[in-house]
Amino acid sequence: MATYNYPEFGAGLWHFANYIDRYAVDGYGPALSTIDQINAAKEVGELSYVDLPYPFTPGVTLSEVKDALKDAGLKAIGITPEIYLQKWSRGAFTNPDPAARAAAFELMHESAGIVRELGANYVKVWPGQDGWDYPFQVSHKNLWKLAVDGMRDLAGANPDVKFAIEYKPREPRVKMTWDSAARTLLGIEDIGLDNVGVLLDFGHALYGGESPADSAQLIIDRGRLFGMDVNDNLRGWDDDLVVGTVHMTEIFEFFYVLKINNWQGVWQLDQFPFRENHVEAAQLSIRFLKHIYRALDKLDIPALQAAQEAQNPLQAQRIVQDALLSSITVSE
């Protein structure tokens, strides 16, 4: 039997948190501290990295987080400032209140400091409240200027830290400012700094009507793919389901694009197992990602590229199926 040198796997720490929605306002489980979540991530057994929301839960110190990560054998890949909570319900970068914008910038500067302290790869910027809900609500010119200028100021003040923008079409805003791969790349071009890139969420690309593989290629071609998250959904909402449960072929194409471009990075989960066991959901996800990795090893890439050159979809599918389905016969 072949042995495989699998990639490193990671997860957003929220994978192990408690969730609420607009119906179950009392939550789907007990409140869990940052330390509790790190300990749960440890139970998965095959995670190397976690992305940590910041600030940490009340009462948890940076020193305690460092100790917990060390004890769990985990490292921080990113810090995600929570610039989407109640305080910034009208926006972070684009809030009409200058004081609210200043408070958001302060939190993001603090997050850059945490990245340095933990040796993480980047600050993940997900400005979920930046955008609008109604026609005529905003000046699109002014809103875009606030978003782009704000990112430029933030990244320019922290040139030693990478900032990865995670785009998404909508939710919580009806329309988010950073809503697509193309728009995010245009904004990064306007920003004009090397330390600003993209964190590509597979589910956000699906939900936005994109091909995640196509989006990945677009971003890689411009040297801006700083990180990625995988999950799954039914394309009508950001369901954050367990990866591979719906779009198996498209997730394979996504990782194929990463492979042929020699993109080296953590294979990271961004999932919300509301009703499922959090640890088991992560373990099942990693099991599937290992299947994908083995399938990439089996894939006849020259034959596939010849089929693609001829734009022969049936031949391409035959080659893909031979690799993808045969990889699943190996038990985990």
Curated annotation (Swiss-Prot):
Molecular function terms from GO:
metal ion binding; xylose isomerase activity
The record lists the catalysed reaction(s) as: aldehydo-D-apiose = apulose
Q: Which residues bind Mg(2+) 1?
A: E166, D201, D229, D270
**Pathway it works in:** Carbohydrate metabolism
Q: Which InterPro entries match?
A: IolE/XylAMocC-like, Xyl_isomerase-like_sf, Xyl_isomerase-like_TIM-brl, Xylose_isomerase
Location (main, coarse): cytoplasm
Q: Where is the signal peptide?
A: none
List residues binding Mg(2+) 2. H204, D238, D240
Q: Name one Pfam family in it.
A: AP_endonuc_2
Q: Which UniProt keywords apply?
A: Carbohydrate metabolism, Cytoplasm, Isomerase, Magnesium, Metal-binding
| GO CC terms of this entry | cytoplasm
Assigned EC number? 5.3.1.36
Q: How is the cofactor bound?
A: Binds 2 magnesium ions per subunit.
Q: Which GO terms describe its biological process?
A: carbohydrate metabolic process
- Subcellular locations according to the entry: Cytoplasm
Indicate the segments annotated as coiled coil, or none if absent. none
Gene3D superfamilies, A to Z: Divalent-metal-dependent TIM barrel enzymes
What job does this protein perform? Involved in catabolism of D-apiose. Catalyzes isomerization of D-apiose to apulose.
Q: Which family does the record assign?
A: Belongs to the xylose isomerase family.
- Which PANTHER family does this UniProt record tie to the protein? HYDROXYPYRUVATE ISOMERASE, XYLOSE ISOMERASE-LIKE TIM BARREL DOMAIN-CONTAINING PROTEIN
Protein name (record): D-apiose isomerase
* Organism in which the protein naturally occurs: Pectobacterium atrosepticum (strain SCRI 1043 / ATCC BAA-672)
Q: What is the lineage of its organism?
A: Bacteria, Pseudomonadati, Pseudomonadota, Gammaproteobacteria, Enterobacterales
